[in-house]
């Protein structure tokens, strides 16, 4: 039975971009239409999978089939440590200040009508389909508010997808609803037919069986794992019984020299809190075993059909995660390595096996890379990211960036939580013991610098303290000591300047390796005044 297409009764019929929207894109791939053996692309995206705390450990088959067959990036970051802003960055190739998705709510532009009108027509899948002639397939979690009645419901199919099997709202494993090319299909709690990771695997295998062989394809498969509620498949629910969350140097300690939200965490954590996060850690790993199976099934199918050697496979996550670091129980959202660093593994034609790249990359680079593979002229986009293709192909004369931007706008309202009256107003994502993971003014921007000379992180907060955090990651990989008050003021000024440049960049100016303005003079007093910097005010009040 042929899979139904998102285009309607005629399978494979492309949904065209509106003519006016298509005009700026024309010319990119047209020269490649009809070219032999254009590569296929498979993008596998997990939900909340860290790189710092052993997130790849359970995925032995994935590491063997993708990482060992290609390249593993050891310095891959997300521009925002939260699902919807990060996923929007993958799709658009833009930093959050340019796509304006700031959190997981409709009000924060997550799958809102504004997002659908302004950003979706220019995502890289839209270009792949309407300009480059690719068959495009999506299955799994899209954006956290996808399917909301106020934003088109499940009938909405974003431009750019030939086959659309999207999850309503946030990650679940059972009792969910899928949009099957715009029509709702409910699932229950029968493992054999409803377990979402396996459902996504089966939909993907069906697509590979029934797709057209005359056009290249792009597949994006977005699993619920290892996001809460961490429901493992029955056969894996006893796995990792002796595993606990890593007790690294920043586990269960007080964030003494950090911004106020981290300082409010209670140290030491209670025994019940530690038992809870250890259980969560184990269950997260258990859910990833089904992802490992999914990867194996897809690679085997591509191999059996003779398409593996012409297919690029990307494996990554939308953000990292923490389990007890600085006494924060479990979540993401924070600026530290455990939340912003993610796995990134790539295999494909021309990529030598068993490589590790230390180059500084971001998920805004995925879209430009995939368009580059398809032959599209990246100069015709307004994407902020850079193509990874020169790195993947081993270009020895490559000039690359030394800085990437991380930015986040806190969730919550400036009111007191009645269940935690002793805390400051505006906290959110609070646990029963009133340890909170977010707040309305947990708004920050960071520049992550990695070069032959420096391995630093510099962050500014838009709060009453106008707090600054700086870390030497080489000397302090667990980010225990904030050196903002002791670092050389000249270096501090350079980092501040780099941050301002990145927060004001757009398109080509984001892709230019950082060069300092020799005329720039830094005034330390401006950083710690009570009014906030021009940069932070602009970010927090940027219109959607």
Curated annotation (Swiss-Prot):
Active site per the UniProt annotation: 83
Gene Ontology annotations for the cellular component aspect, listed alphabetically: azurophil granule; lysosome
Cofactor note: Binds 1 Ca(2+) ion per subunit.
Phosphoserine: modified positions: 533
Record's subcellular location: Lysosome
Domain of life: Eukaryota
EC number, as in UniProt: 3.1.6.14
Function recorded in the entry: Hydrolyzes 6-sulfate groups in N-acetyl-d-glucosaminide units of heparin sulfate and keratan sulfate.
Protein name per the record: N-acetylglucosamine-6-sulfatase
Source organism of this protein record: Mus musculus (Mouse)
